[in-house]
Amino acid sequence: MWRRQHALLRRISLPKPPAATGIGCYYATEPEGRKPKTAPLQSRGMVDRFRLRAKGGDGGNGCISLRRSRSDRQGKPDGGNGGRGGDVILECSRSVWDFSGLQHHMKASRGANGVSKNQIGTRGSDKIAQVPVGTVIHLVEGEQPSLSVNKPTRALDPWDIPDAVEHSPFSSSRIGSKMMKGLDSSRSSQHISSKKNTAENDCERGNRNHRGKEPYYMTEFVRTEDYDGTSYPHQVGVDENDQFDDEDDEFWEDDEEELDMEEVTEEKEEEEDVRYSVAEMTKPGQRLIIARGGEGGLGNACILKEMWLSKAHKEEEMASLSTGHPGTETYLILELKSIADVGLVGMPNAGKSTLLSALSRARPEIADYAFTTLRPNIGSLTYEDYFSVKVADIPGLIKGAHENRGLGHAFLRHIERTKVLAYVLDLAATLNGRKGVPPWEQLRDLVVELEHYQEGLTKRPSLIVANKIDEEGADEMYEELKKRVQGVPMFPICAILQEGVPDLRVGLRDLMDASDPQGIELSKIVVD
């Protein structure tokens, strides 16, 4: 009772807190640990060239186990095979637009070890990375990747496909005498062929008794030139929190310093010493296996009885058979060739970025100096009937771009897949004492560079955008341009004031819907 009264007296005697004032508390600096905000999409540089090292997951080790009973004191082998390592896969997707979301080092999960009672280890999870449509893969080191098409032939068991991934048709649970004789050679290039013998029958009988079904998931791998893109694999789940084993740290020792995003975006476009081009991913859903997982080691239940009883093989070859195979490693260079409906082509400072901002909601960097745009910018032009056209702002081209002058190859590769070419010409290049190039000569130089880079590129549907019509004397220059270039749609505009932009939108739509559009021929351009 007295304690309750004492607590009440203390509560009454405590002073009240001071009234809140209008003065707030401000931090001089941001709290520690808070990440800075990411720059908006328009101000971030487009990463269209990327270096990637990939390693498949190692196979799990086979289990060495004996099952003893009253009738069999020595015991029978019942160790299961190790699981196959996961693959590293590139998946083509429309949800990404460059390589900024990729990691320079990718590694799939390791297969689980086999256990007793003839239980096979779980297959390692695949590591899947999404790349934009139009990605070109070049191989520097490692084995050649291959596109894959899934064709399941029967109902699949969850332990066979933990993440709905492919499994090699050469299962690690099958054995043969050829494998036993070639142990001294490289095991990574060998597979285990099935043979009718007692050891194999015991192995497969143990698998069926444990699972009830044949644990095989056949996958057909096809070459790049044979892939028709008609059948795409289903979505595959990926564990983003995959942790690597300590025994795999050797893969990362050679590359301790990873490139920052700023180093990648500011990286110069140099000629890479690549051996050959591997594939081009142009359709959503295509998947490319760039690093394969290693096969799992054999358990003693699937090893020939003669080898198990032989003392000569028991220590050396038995240990090598039960060890899982390492995954393959590859070093790739990814390049992006933008896939857009319309490509804005022109000399530096012709007003291409300003025109893109007038046609769409894209906000590229705009300045009054040459080569403001070093990475292509893509905007979307939407019409009233919800018809959408993708417009790409290609960086400025100069004379000799086809010889890689002024990063020409890095810019020209983005034009290869555009359906329509819009030549943006500067009408005011020679006005008011400017030492520029007349618009008809600009057009001739652009046509020559495109034709030298890829024959037939200028035969695509084309139109001419005569920019900066608001300058004094630009009307006379435009009339002279119409006399020198004929047979091509021409639109005089002022991109910064958006004069003539609505007519240009209609012209682009008509050119997209035209049944027999015409390109630009060099012979139809009259130059002094």
Curated annotation (Swiss-Prot):
Entry-linked CDD domains: Obg
Localisation: Mitochondrion
Protein name (database record): Probable GTP-binding protein OBGM, mitochondrial
Keyword presence, Nuclease: no
Positions of the Obg domain: 46-339
Molecular function in Gene Ontology: GTP binding; GTPase activity; magnesium ion binding
The organism's place on the tree of life at top rank: Eukaryota
Gene: OBGM
Family statement: Belongs to the TRAFAC class OBG-HflX-like GTPase superfamily. OBG GTPase family.
Role summary: May bind GTP and have GTPase activity.
Biased composition annotated in UniProt, kind: Gly residues: 77-86
Species of provenance: Oryza sativa subsp. japonica (Rice)
Location, primary (coarse class): mitochondrion
OBG-type G domain residues: 340-513
Region: Disordered, residue numbers: 52-87, 167-212
Transit peptide segment: 1-45
Binding site for GTP: 346-353, 393-397
InterPro entries: G_OBG, GTP-bd, GTP-bd_Obg/CgtA, GTP1_OBG_dom, GTP1_OBG_dom_sf, OBG_GTPase, P-loop_NTPase
Key words, A-Z: GTP-binding, Mitochondrion, Nucleotide-binding, Transit peptide
Assigned GO CC terms: mitochondrion
Biased composition (Basic and acidic residues): 197-207
PANTHER family referenced in this protein's UniProt entry, alphabetically: DEVELOPMENTALLY REGULATED GTP-BINDING PROTEIN-RELATED, MITOCHONDRIAL RIBOSOME-ASSOCIATED GTPASE 2
Pfam families hit by this protein: GTP1_OBG, MMR_HSR1
